[in-house]
Amino acid sequence: DTVPRVYYADLYTDDGQYMATKSPFFDAINTLLKARVQYVAGGQSMSVDSNDVLTSVRYGKNAMTASDTGTSETRTEGVGVIVSNNAELQLEDGHTVTLHMGAAHKNQAYRALLSTTADGLAYYDTDENAPVAYTDANGDLIFTNESIYGVQNPQVSGYLAVWVPVGAQQDQDARTASDTTTNTSDKVFHSNAALDSQVIYEGFSNFQAFATDSSEYTNVVIAQNADQFKQWGVTSFQLAPQYRSSTDTSFLDSIIQNGYAFTDRYDLGYGTPTQYGAVDHVRA
């Protein structure tokens, strides 16, 4: 069991002011994180076929296996992912890729959340205008070489697609809160739906530019974007190292003042700000 951990520089460029410039991958990660809140729950199955295409399915809450029929809540949850890292992927005629969405999702409409195009990726935040496919009587979504093929572009080297049920409410939350889950072991971490609902965000880069005014301090910008982190489902936020940099230039980390030099000292920004802000910005 693992908890997803998203890195700042996957979403924003390392250089420049904090959160000022989005990376080429921002839209994809933004779409996936929001969808994780809305759809991801229940049991999981993963497999790799003879074409080295990986499929991963989450069945939705109250369904741990493909044979579970679940509840009405299960019906609008769950997600199917298709991944290949082969830019030359070409399925032979008659070959298919199947997402076994499970018995809870028989004869159901699914829509693309994210799909590969010749030029990059297409994103669909709602049911409107999204490509639609239907599961069969076994709950299978079946795709042919008409829709699955390898590409090479700045967004994708291979193939990527994500499918979710049609008809989910925009404010649907498939996560499980920790305070609703009973733990009976003496372990620190418990493998359950509550742990599965966690997301860690490493929210800083060692190489970002120095702030030119107080509005650009990392800790100020983080507070201003709290709603966005909530939409992403972030439950643990790894802040930048709140250290007073030595600035003695004897070591790379003291030159870029990232808080990792040998003589740096922990300081939230008392008196004068650190690279990341003043103590009042942390308190806010």
Swiss-Prot record:
The enzyme's E.C. designation: 2.4.1.5
| Further information | The dextran produced by Leuconostoc mesenteroides CMG713 has a molecular mass of about 2000 kDa and contains exclusively alpha-(1->6) glycosidic linkages in the main chain.
Pfam (any one) = Glyco_hydro_70
Molecular function (Gene Ontology), one example: glucosyltransferase activity
> Which protein is depicted?
Dextransucrase 1
GO BP: glucan biosynthetic process
Q: Does the keyword Transit peptide apply?
A: no
Which chemical reaction does it catalyze?
[(1->6)-alpha-D-glucosyl](n) + sucrose = [(1->6)-alpha-D-glucosyl](n+1) + D-fructose
| Keywords from the UniProt entry | Glycosyltransferase, Transferase
Protein species of origin: Leuconostoc mesenteroides
The family line of this record is: Belongs to the glycosyl hydrolase 70 family.
Traced from the root, the source organism's taxonomic lineage reads: Bacteria, Bacillati, Bacillota, Bacilli, Lactobacillales
Gene from which this protein is expressed: dsrF
Query: InterPro entries given for it?
Result: Glyco_hydro70cat, Glycoside_hydrolase_SF
Q: What does this protein do?
A: Involved in the production of dextran, an extracellular glucan polymer.
